Amino acid sequence: MSAPISIVIPTLESARTLPVTLLSLIEGVDEGLICEVVVSDGGSKDATQSIAEAWGAEVVEGPSSRGGQLRRGVALSRGVWVLILHSDTVLQAGWALEVQQWMDRGPQCFSLAFNASGIAARLVAAWANLRTDLLCLPYGDQGLLLRRIDYDEAGGYPDQPLMEDVALVWALSPRVRRMQSHAFTGAEKYQQQGWMRRGVRNLILLARYSAGVKPEDLARAYLPSDPPN
């Protein structure tokens, strides 16, 4: 059987973090899971695209809207399954074995962890994992593994600058389940803005989006000082 999973990674000025993300995928190649890596770039001026190409990834470029980038990346991919990862996410060693065991159970995400120590990092990650278990609402930094047919039936990622991960998860018919393997994500924004402040900001953002505020209006309020990875 051919390798079933396409990896899709949205990038923007990701030269510093992308190599470690790609390195964590090697075990998936060794296990015969990954057929390709697609990097959907939003117009990086650093070495992001050349790094991706050096690692053998397919690169597609377009406007820097994460929803649009993901939509283009998935459209270019060919795997029966798609695994969406952020460019600052590193998968825990052993992830490929768990993915093999869970692939027949529908959409999956990883357990969130931060590449930082301290109680604040653990509490924020614990809340994210609890939210996933109770509300079936993971965020994009936990990764998302799903069958292409489920992705297509949900309408795919909307071309919007943020909350594209929430929009897709809400549209999925099979509920997303959380695996035990961790996705370690960057903590720089939390460390710069403060763990509490950043966490409250994310809750307000979700609440406003849930109340019907347009993603473009949210982006004007939040993204000028907080560009996506």
Q: Where would I find each of the regions flagged by the language model?
A:
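Hydrophobic helical membrane-anchoring modules
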Residues: 1, 170-229
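Cell-envelope/extracellular polymer assembly enzymes that use nucleotide-activated donors
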Residues: 4-6, 36, 167
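Short, well-formed alpha-helical segments that are part of the catalytic scaffolds
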Residues: 13-29
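Short beta-strand/loop segment that forms part of the nucleotide-sugar
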Residues: 23-26, 33-43, 62
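A conserved acidic beta->alpha catalytic loop
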Residues: 41-49, 89
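Short aromatic/hydrophobic "clamp" motif used to bind/position activated sugar donors
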Residues: 82
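Conserved donor NDP-sugar-binding/catalytic core segment of glycosyltransferases
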Residues: 93-120
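A short, conserved alpha-helix in the catalytic core of glycosyltransferases
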Residues: 150-154, 160-178, 182
